[in-house]
Each structure stands twice: as structure tokens, then as C-alpha cells.
Amino acid sequence: MLQSMVQTGPEFLHQGTHLNLEFPAIQELSLTFLRKPIYWRIGMPNTSTLVIPKKMSLLLLL
């Protein structure tokens, strides 16, 4: 999909490269956020309530 957007014309080049550069970082943060709360709930349920809001604030800063 990104490739077709870039190939459509010069007006889509910036948008395509912008998504291409930022998506891996967002995906990595999302996967980290999805994995760790599950581990926290199983191993340390009391601390999960303290750590998850910090993770959410990091995602909101993007």
C-alpha cells in the first residue's frame, strides 16, 4: 500500500516516506506495550497499575 502511494506521484512521496519512517517505531512500541502488561499481570499484578499509565503517556507523546 505504501509503495502504491509513493508511485502515484510526487505529492504522495512525503506522506509515503513519513509513514514508512514512523510505522516501525509505532509498531515496536505497540508490541512492547501489548507484551509487557500481560507479563506484569501474571507476575506482578500490583506494579502493573503503576507502569501501564507511563507506557500510555509515552504512546500519547508520539
Curated annotation (Swiss-Prot):
Protein name as annotated: Uncharacterized protein P6
Source organism of this protein record: Potato leafroll virus (strain Potato/Scotland/strain 1/1984)
